């Protein structure tokens, strides 16, 4: 193992060397990833997030993996943008069960001018509760990123999904360059980036390596890198894809950890299909973030109590973050709710 692998943050990875990491013996790869992980993180701490779908279904994008796409008949019930108060109530629940970050996702190509004021109120309200805030709203322009940053948004999620070469086989309604441009706007506005991809869409090893290279060779690494395993949903074009080999998925996590040593690598969608042994291997490979709770946008996620039971058996604890004192925290929640009740924007955006 080279010293540079454990000590240096790089932005010049080449395909051949990344493929060589993937092709190592499994135990060697995990040892290397765990060594890198321990150099930058407490190996027995995992960051815990909760994800809420604030607007579900009827998305105009044609992402072949997604049950929210309006192009496919998946039986998913379309829902309007959630009211701000309801979002804050869900955020309070997430806080109560141990989440430190609250992520809000909307099935949009991009947020409209009509919806942005409501979105900004959600950010401000959740932030006031002492939670980190994250949103995924689709493509953003420069003004929207500035507005979100000013409202206090900590993270913006915008996945690259796969390699540039394979991307056109999965999505045709948005270009890869548009995704990269959104990430650039987010970074320029001073927010942190959450960006990763999906395994199990029919991609090759070159594509998996290519995705990680795109992320690792950005001017700054994403602070959070979600690695998703395809959740096959009837009605989507990828519903019959072959399952991802569990060891291949663990390899993806390990290589992500080596390439982006200071990033949180998130064990994301597909965790419901993983047994406890596979999840334990994922943490050994350097995954140190999970989504917590019963739903991951529109697909099932392991129940929160099961997560805590597994953490206890593995000696893992949720990653701590700076908190307000209980009294101040409760006051912040109450104040946020009062402000929302008195705001003219405290209504369903779809009726505006």
UniProtKB/Swiss-Prot annotation:
It catalyses: (4R,5S)-dethiobiotin + (sulfur carrier)-SH + 2 reduced [2Fe-2S]-[ferredoxin] + 2 S-adenosyl-L-methionine = (sulfur carrier)-H + biotin + 2 5'-deoxyadenosine + 2 L-methionine + 2 oxidized [2Fe-2S]-[ferredoxin]. Binds 1 [4Fe-4S] cluster. The cluster is coordinated with 3 cysteines and an exchangeable S-adenosyl-L-methionine. Binds 1 [2Fe-2S] cluster. The cluster is coordinated with 3 cysteines and 1 arginine. Its cofactor is [4Fe-4S] cluster; [2Fe-2S] cluster. It holds the Pfam family Radical_SAM. InterPro entries: Aldolase_TIM (IPR013785), BATS_dom (IPR010722), Biotin_synth/BioAB (IPR002684), Biotin_synthase (IPR024177), Elp3/MiaA/NifB-like_rSAM (IPR006638), rSAM (IPR007197). Residues 44-262 form the Radical SAM core domain. GO terms for molecular function: 2 iron, 2 sulfur cluster binding; 4 iron, 4 sulfur cluster binding; biotin synthase activity; iron ion binding. Disulfide bonds: none annotated. Keywords: 2Fe-2S, 4Fe-4S, Biotin biosynthesis, Iron, Iron-sulfur, Metal-binding, S-adenosyl-L-methionine, Transferase. Belongs to the radical SAM superfamily. Biotin synthase family. This is Biotin synthase. It comes from Pseudomonas putida (strain ATCC 47054 / DSM 6125 / CFBP 8728 / NCIMB 11950 / KT2440). The gene is bioB.
């Amino acid at each position: 193992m080279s010293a540079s692998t454990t000590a240096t943050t790089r932005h010049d990875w080449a395909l051949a060397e990344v493929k060589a990491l993937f092709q190592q013996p499994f135990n060697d790869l995990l040892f290397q990833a765990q060594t890198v992980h321990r150099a930058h993180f407490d190996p027995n701490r995992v960051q815990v997030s909760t994800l809420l779908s604030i607007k579900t279904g009827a998305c105009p994008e044609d992402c072949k993996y997604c049950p929210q796409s309006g192009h496919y008949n998946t039986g998913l019930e379309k829902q309007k943008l959630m009211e701000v108060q309801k979002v804050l109530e869900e955020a309070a629940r997430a806080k109560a069960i141990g989440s430190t970050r609250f992520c809000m996702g909307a099935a949009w190509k991009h947020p409209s001018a009509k919806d942005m004021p409501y979105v900004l109120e959600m950010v401000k309200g959740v932030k006031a509760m002492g939670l980190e805030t994250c949103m995924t709203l689709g493509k953003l322009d420069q003004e929207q990123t500035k507005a979100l940053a000013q409202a206090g948004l900590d993270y913006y999620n915008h996945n690259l999904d796969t390699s540039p070469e394979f991307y056109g086989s999965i999505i045709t309604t948005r270009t890869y360059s548009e995704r990269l441009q959104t990430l650039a706007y987010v970074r320029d506005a001073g927010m942190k980036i959450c960006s990763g991809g999906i395994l199990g869409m029919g991609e090759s090893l070159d594509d998996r390596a290519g995705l990680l290279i795109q992320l690792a060779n950005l001017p700054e690494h994403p602070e959070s890198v979600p690695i998703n395993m395809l959740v096959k949903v009837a009605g989507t074009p990828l519903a019959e894809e072959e399952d991802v080999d569990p060891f291949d998925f663990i390899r993806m996590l390990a290589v992500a950890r080596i390439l982006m040593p200071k990033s949180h690598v998130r064990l994301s969608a597909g965790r419901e299909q993983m047994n406890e042994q596979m999840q334990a291997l994922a943490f050994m490979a350097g995954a140190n973030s999970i989504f917590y709770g019963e739903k991951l946008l529109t697909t099932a996620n392991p129940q929160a109590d099961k997560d805590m039971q597994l953490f206890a058996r593995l000696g893992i604890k949720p990653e701590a973050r700076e908190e307000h004192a209980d009294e101040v925290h409760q006051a912040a929640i109450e104040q946020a709710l009062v402000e929302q009740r008195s705001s003219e924007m405290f209504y369903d955006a779809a009726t505006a």
